[in-house]
Amino acid sequence: MYRLIMALLMFMFVASPGYSQSFRDNNNMLLGKVESDGTVRNANNMRLGKIFEDGTIRDSNNMRLGSIEKDGTIRDKNNMRLGTVSSDGTVRDNNNMRLGTISSDGTVRNNNNMRVGTASGINTRYAAVLFFFNLL
């Protein structure tokens, strides 16, 4: 459940009309994608849920999983703060500990600066959430 929330969170406010956006692990294996309407699918094209324009994230059964605020604050289904994604791509947990970064080219790095994956066509502020909060 936690991984699903994070996968959905990473795509908030980032779906662009006309194409889907993908995220891959360090071995370039497809982890999933988000469609232009906000629908999130895994690598097997199974629908995981949807991200809505207001920041609400729901699973495939329409259950609220969490949200992401416009300032980058990530919240769980009980509205508890999980962490943040800053405009420069830095990801921090709820205790303000730096977890890693995602660069403007989509490269995701952990706190030791090791590459952990990529996020193609995905807003860096939200893509980092998947890799650092492991909700998918």
Description of each model-found segment:
Residues 2-48, 53-55, 63-64, 70-136:
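Long terminal segments
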